[in-house]
UniProtKB/Swiss-Prot annotation:
Gene Ontology BP terms: defense response
InterPro entries found in the cross-reference section: PP2-like, PP2-like/Lectin
Function, in words: Binds with high affinity specifically to chito-oligosaccharides. May play a role in plant defense against pathogens by directly binding with the chitin cell wall. Forms filamentous structures at higher concentrations and may promote wound healing by forming filaments with phloem proteins like PP1.
Name recorded for this polypeptide: Lectin
Length: 157
């Protein structure tokens, strides 16, 4: 179970549904089991990387039309988190190629507390917005980043 449609207005993509660069190498990422509504799922815990790149894709046919969705990622910065003083790029790309992009610095976020990282908002309204919805979170600067845990990416009305 890597994604879960909780209702027609709430959709979750768990970390295993994402493409996380270096996630198959235990020197950089580890997978922590968590219970979610009786399902055994995993959070992705970053040990350290310099090339931080996380990508998710969902088909908009899984979403309800003419409903505004708020897209966010659950993140926790551990007590030893560091290297987050350069901006992360957040992108939400619609099937028609239109993009929402922003940047965020995580260095000053509270430690050991889950928070929502806002990715954007969207509405699936017609054939131009039907297809693959792509969400990205990345920073390719060479400084080492460590100590973040990724939870689910949520699309909720």
């Amino acid at each position: 179970l890597n994604q879960e449609k909780l209702s027609s207005t709430h959709f979750l993509l768990f970390p295993r549904a994402a493409t996380l660069t270096w996630s198959d190498d235990t020197r950089y990422w580890s997978w922590n089991p968590v219970d979610f509504c009786g399902y055994q799922l995993e959070e992705a815990q970053l040990s350290r990387v310099s090339w931080f790149d996380c990508r998710w894709t969902v088909n908009t046919t899984d979403l309800k039309t003419n409903v505004w969705y708020n897209v966010f990622l659950k993140v926790q910065m551990g007590s030893g988190a560091s290297g987050w003083n350069t901006p992360l790029n957040l992108e939400l790309e619609m099937p028609n190629g239109s993009k929402q992009a922003s940047q965020v610095v995580l260095n000053d976020r509270p430690r050991d507390v889950w928070f929502k990282l806002q990715m954007g908002n969207l509405m699936v309204s017609d054939s131009e917005t039907c297809g693959a919805l792509r969400m990205s979170l990345y920073n390719h600067q060479t400084n080492w980043k460590m100590g973040a845990t990724l939870g689910p990416l949520a699309l909720e009305a």
